[in-house]
UniProtKB/Swiss-Prot annotation:
Subunit structure of this chain's protein: Homodimer. Part of the ribosomal stalk of the 50S ribosomal subunit. Forms a multimeric L10(L12)X complex, where L10 forms an elongated spine to which 2 to 4 L12 dimers bind in a sequential fashion. Binds GTP-bound translation factors.
GO function term, MF aspect, one: mRNA binding
Cited InterPro entries: Ribosomal_bL12, Ribosomal_bL12_C, Ribosomal_bL12_C/ClpS-like, Ribosomal_bL12_oligo, Ribosomal_bL12_oligo_N_sf
This protein's UniProt keywords: Ribonucleoprotein, Ribosomal protein
Role of this protein: Forms part of the ribosomal stalk which helps the ribosome interact with GTP-bound translation factors. Is thus essential for accurate translation.
Name of the featured protein: Large ribosomal subunit protein bL12
CDD domains per the UniProt record, alphabetical: Ribosomal_L7_L12
GO BP annotations, alphabetical order: translation
Family matches, as SUPFAM superfamilies: ClpS-like, Ribosomal protein L7/12, oligomerisation (N-terminal) domain
GO CC aspect terms: cytosolic large ribosomal subunit
Region (Disordered): 95-125
Family as reported in the entry's similarity comment: Belongs to the bacterial ribosomal protein bL12 family.
Domain of life: Bacteria
Length: 125
């Protein structure tokens, strides 16, 4: 009997971030595809370039460096992401890494502030 789409979605929804990362890698190897986000090219604007441009609405919080107090940084990462202890530790140990992606400016700034208060070096992109 074949697995239904709903069963697959339920299984993926219950996976940890590390398991999802392994799943993506397996898909890339099995099907020869890349999970990298594709750049979307918008229509060219009329006239010269708009020097100001549109304000960025989605941000990525990057952990640049864990700093001296790794335990506090791991706790902050767990609080920000909801990851388990092992996943958060692996993420901190693997810095520089993105912590949160595609979030609004307020959420990104709050996450950056928590990381910096814990002793980490973080940046917004």
């Amino acid at each position: 009997m074949a697995i239904t789409k709903e069963e697959i979605i339920e299984a993926v929804g219950s996976m940890s971030v590390m398991d999802l990362n392994d799943l993506v890698k397996a898909f890339e190897e099995k099907f020869g595809v890349s999970a990298a986000a594709m750049a979307v090219v918008g229509p060219a604007g009329a006239g010269g370039g708009d020097a100001g441009g549109a304000e960025q609405t989605e941000f990525t919080v990057n952990l640049v460096e864990a700093g001296a107090n790794k335990v506090s940084v791991i706790k902050a990462v767990r609080e920000i992401t909801g990851l388990g202890l092992k996943e958060a530790k692996d993420l901190v140990d693997g810095a520089p890494k993105p912590i949160k992606e595609g979030v609004d400016k307020k959420t990104a700034e709050e996450a950056k502030k928590k990381l910096e208060e814990a002793g980490a070096k973080a940046e917004l992109k």
